[in-house]
């Protein structure tokens, strides 16, 4: 069983449409109007409806009320900034910290060129990119967990 719906080129109705320049002359269904006109609006409206419904059914607050006269003991950024916060906190030289943060996107830009020799799309057949992804994910999670700890345990996570 195939995932793609291939057209039956022996069908006379389809051949007549193709002769007039209508329809599509390759496998699958056309994006217009099937996806763009019918499927996408349903998905977008469904997502908006789910978000509004969940906000109405469970109106939770975003946290405790702020007190401008009381400073918290330790100020932490939002959770998605934990790895970069920990990286800047652990590296003593500010210039090296900023350069290490700039090296992340620069390194990610080089991965397609390193793996360009391999034309496979299966990630298990692209070992360099898969290895870089897995190591980067582990390092990011490690730095994110370390950002919530005191600075002397930020790299070792208190394990060593």
From Swiss-Prot:
InterPro entries given in the database record: Cyt_b/b6_C, Cyt_b/b6_C_sf, Cyt_b6/f_cplx_suIV, Cytochrome_b_C_euk/bac
Q: Does the keyword Membrane apply?
A: yes
**Cross-referenced Gene3D superfamilies:** plastocyanin oxidoreductase, Single helix bin
Recorded GO molecular functions are: electron transporter, transferring electrons within cytochrome b6/f complex of photosystem II activity; electron transporter, transferring electrons within the cyclic electron transport pathway of photosynthesis activity; oxidoreductase activity
Membrane topology, record value: Multi-pass membrane protein
- Write down the CDD domains for this protein, in alphabetical order: cytochrome_b_C
Domain of life, per UniProt, equals Eukaryota
Q: Could you state one GO biological process linked to this protein?
A: photosynthetic electron transport chain
What residue ranges are annotated as transmembrane? 36-56, 95-115, 131-151
Kindly list the GO CC terms recorded for this protein.
chloroplast thylakoid membrane
Compartments annotated for it: namely:
Plastid, Chloroplast thylakoid membrane
Q: What SUPFAM superfamilies does the entry give? A: a domain/subunit of cytochrome bc1 complex (Ubiquinol-cytochrome c reductase) (SSF81648)
Coarsely, its chief localization is plastid
Keywords assigned by UniProt, alphabetized: Chloroplast, Electron transport, Membrane, Photosynthesis, Plastid, Thylakoid, Transmembrane, Transmembrane helix, Transport
Q: Which Pfam families match?
A: Cytochrom_B_C
Subunit structure, interactors included = The 4 large subunits of the cytochrome b6-f complex are cytochrome b6, subunit IV (17 kDa polypeptide, petD), cytochrome f and the Rieske protein, while the 4 small subunits are petG, petL, petM and petN. The complex functions as a dimer.
Q: Family, per the entry?
A: Belongs to the cytochrome b family. PetD subfamily.
Q: What does this protein do?
A: Component of the cytochrome b6-f complex, which mediates electron transfer between photosystem II (PSII) and photosystem I (PSI), cyclic electron flow around PSI, and state transitions.
Q: Note the PANTHER family from the entry.
A: CYTOCHROME B
Protein name stated in the entry = Cytochrome b6-f complex subunit 4
Organism, as annotated:
Porphyra purpurea
Q: What is the lineage of its organism?
A: Eukaryota, Rhodophyta, Bangiophyceae, Bangiales, Bangiaceae
Q: Which gene encodes it?
A: petD
